[in-house]
Swiss-Prot record:
The enzyme's E.C. designation: 3.6.1.15
Task of the protein: Has nucleotide phosphatase activity towards ATP, GTP, CTP, TTP and UTP. Hydrolyzes nucleoside diphosphates with lower efficiency.
Disulfide feature: none
Substrates-to-products reaction catalysed: a ribonucleoside 5'-triphosphate + H2O = a ribonucleoside 5'-diphosphate + phosphate + H(+); 5-methyl-UTP + H2O = 5-methyl-UDP + phosphate + H(+); CTP + H2O = CDP + phosphate + H(+); ATP + H2O = ADP + phosphate + H(+)
HAMAP family assigned: NTPase_1 (MF_00796)
Pfam families: NTPase_1 (PF03266)
Annotated positions of the N6-acetyllysine modification: K165
Protein name according to UniProt: Cancer-related nucleoside-triphosphatase
GO cellular component: membrane; mitochondrion
Modified residues (N-acetylalanine): A2
Residues annotated as binding ATP: 9-16, 109-116
Length: 190
């Protein structure tokens, strides 16, 4: 049976919106939920990057157009976006570590939106995701990109795990998937 639930689909199809809605439904039913999501940053009608935002509301840059890497650090770039690894790790890693070491009755849900090219520049993030996948008592509700170009090792690893259910989000089904996603996460908690 699936323990972790991941959404996949093309950019802009509504994966993050579904993650938000599912998190709210789960929280309102008393499920402990923590994690982070990525959000587009726009300026003058143009996308200039992405922020990482924790469910507790802390926000920091994930990537920006034309960002200079810190002196002595290698540049991590996806298209026109330069990834701010330090900022990302400062926000995302504590959330994942909290999911790993949290005790208490019942299963916790850890939101990871997303496990994509930008996030995978961080070796510490890769290790933390693998750790969280194998932590009893933690269910991941996350997003992964659709396969395109060179496969991303961790994404393929997740996609092929027997304890993972992957929902393919499309414009046609996105308005009907929420109950299935919530039910799948809730049944993982039993």
């Amino acid at each position: 049976m699936a323990r972790h639930v991941f959404l996949t689909g093309p950019p802009g199809v509504g994966k993050t919106t579904l993650i938000h809605k599912a998190s709210e439904v789960l929280k309102s039913s008393g499920v402990p939920v923590d994690g982070f999501y990525t959000e587009e940053v726009r300026q003058g009608g143009r996308r200039i990057g992405f922020d990482v935002v924790t469910l507790s509301g802390t926000r920091g840059p994930l990537s920006r157009v034309g960002l200079e890497p810190p002196p002595g650090k290698r540049e991590c770039r996806v298209g026109q976006y330069v990834v701010d690894l330090t900022s990302f790790e400062q926000l995302a890693l504590p959330v994942l570590r909290n999911a790993d070491c949290s005790s208490g009755p019942g299963q916790r849900v850890c939101v990871i939106d997303e496990i994509g090219k930008m996030e995978l520049f961080s070796q510490l993030f890769i290790q933390a995701v693998r750790q969280t996948l194998s932590t009893p008592g933690t269910i991941i509700l996350g997003t992964i990109p659709v396969p395109k170009g060179k496969p991303l090792a961790l994404v393929e690893e997740i996609r092929n795990r027997k304890d993972v259910k992957v929902f393919n989000v499309t414009k046609e089904n996105r308005n009907h998937l929420l109950p299935d996603i919530v039910t799948c996460v809730q049944s993982s908690r039993k």
